[in-house]
Amino acid sequence: MTVDLYNYVATVENFPEPGVNFRDISPLMGDGVAYKQAVDAIADFAKDLNVDLIAGPESRGFIVGSPLAYALNIGFVPARKGGKLPRAAVSAAYSLEYGGENVLEIHQDAIKPGQRVLIVDDLLATGGTINATREIIEKLGGIVAGVAFIIELTDLHGREKIMQNGREVPFLTLMTY
């Protein structure tokens, strides 16, 4: 059975600030059929990329990436917020969508040189989180094989920021707003 994933996204107006329509995938994750359909669609995309690992930024990248890695029988690499990892890590800073700056980190032994990595997240907004994750993967010698999202907010131009300067990679979005 195939479902319309758009029916499983709640829109919360004026959150987290006035004028913003927050796209909440909690209903999608709460429905087994919709959640499986989303993960399976990304898994089909990943199979064509011959990936070795899935990476996802904290926190909703974990929700997408973990079942995806399981479905593909490969490892998952969490990109954690700064200061959360207990061992030596590589980091990258990025700007937050609503102002400010943050840092992501990945353990320095999580990705071996030459490993092909698919970066996944629930939602693409400005591209900052994904570019920071990409920067760390490349510092570790990994190859970003592609990126995938459940939702893309097209008016924030995150796709263009990810692909800028000749850095095109295979790209999948299941829904756009």
Swiss-Prot record:
| Protein's UniProt keywords contain Calcium | no
Might you name a Gene Ontology BP term for this protein? purine ribonucleoside salvage
Q: Name one Pfam family in it.
A: Pribosyltran
Pathway recorded for this protein: Purine metabolism; AMP biosynthesis via salvage pathway; AMP from adenine: step 1/1
Compartment list = Cytoplasm
**TM segment ranges:** none
Under InterPro entries, the record lists: Ade_phspho_trans, PRibTrfase_dom, PRTase-like, UPRTase/APRTase
Q: Which reaction does it catalyse?
A: AMP + diphosphate = 5-phospho-alpha-D-ribose 1-diphosphate + adenine
User: What keywords tag this UniProt record?
Assistant: Cytoplasm, Glycosyltransferase, Purine salvage, Transferase
Ligase in keyword set: no
Of the GO CC terms on this record, one is: cytoplasm
- This entry's Enzyme Commission designation comes to 2.4.2.7
Organism's domain of life?
Bacteria
Q: Where does the UniProt entry say this protein principally localizes?
A: cytoplasm
The GO molecular function terms of this record are: adenine binding; adenine phosphoribosyltransferase activity; AMP binding
Entry function: Catalyzes a salvage reaction resulting in the formation of AMP, that is energically less costly than de novo synthesis.
The annotated subunit structure for this chain is: Homodimer.
Q: Which PANTHER family match?
A: ADENINE PHOSPHORIBOSYLTRANSFERASE
Family statement drawn from the similarity comment of this UniProt entry:
Belongs to the purine/pyrimidine phosphoribosyltransferase family.
Q: What is this protein called?
A: Adenine phosphoribosyltransferase
Q: Which gene encodes it?
A: apt
